[in-house]
Amino acid sequence: PLIVIANHPYGILDGLTLGHILEHTRVDFRILANSVFRKAEEINRVVLPISFDEDKEAMALNIATRKRALSYLEDGGAIGIFPGGTVSTAVRPFAKPMDPGWRNFTARMIAKSGASVLPIYFDGHTSRLFQIASHTHNTLRMGLLIKEFGRRVDTPVRVSIGEPISSGALSAFAKDSKGMMDFLRKATYELSPDPLKSFDLGYEFEERHRM
């Protein structure tokens, strides 16, 4: 079994690109992604939907999806996921966009499945307009995601693929979900072709996840 993790700088483009990478390397893969991705016909068939809402329906959906994902991994499949759970956003509008802290949901799935983990780094970020809008109006932010995707059509995406990390190498984090995700987040950002000066957390939209 394999879990592919990646940063999430674009929202739509990196989701499609991750699907493209997995499609050309594995026949047995699924992607855990926001249910909105099911509207994209080309990847709907491989999406296991997750929701970041805080209601009972979202909780039930996520529990069901995790069960399906674990079952898929038990059969030796591959799962792709963006552990940050949201598009990389700068803490301040003119700072560097980064993922927030990575969700423990992924760590629990890694620990339960015993899967190896493959980190992938997507280089780049959304426009400054999107970053500013992200701090002012959530509906505008979501609307601009489509424009961000259109802006990048037919442009290259720099991708760095790391070495697989065995379940044994992560065994020290078996009871430390946050520690595991901090380790994997840093390992992913270290793949940047232009070394980063900082691995600071990006803006966290969900109050329950704020430090």
Give the positions of each predicted feature:
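Catalytic core of membrane glycerolipid acyltransferases/transacylases, capturing the structured
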Residues: 3-58
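Non-catalytic C-terminal accessory region of glycerolipid acyltransferases
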Residues: 62-211
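Solvent-exposed, flexible loop/coil residues
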Residues: 1, 16, 41, 51-54, ...
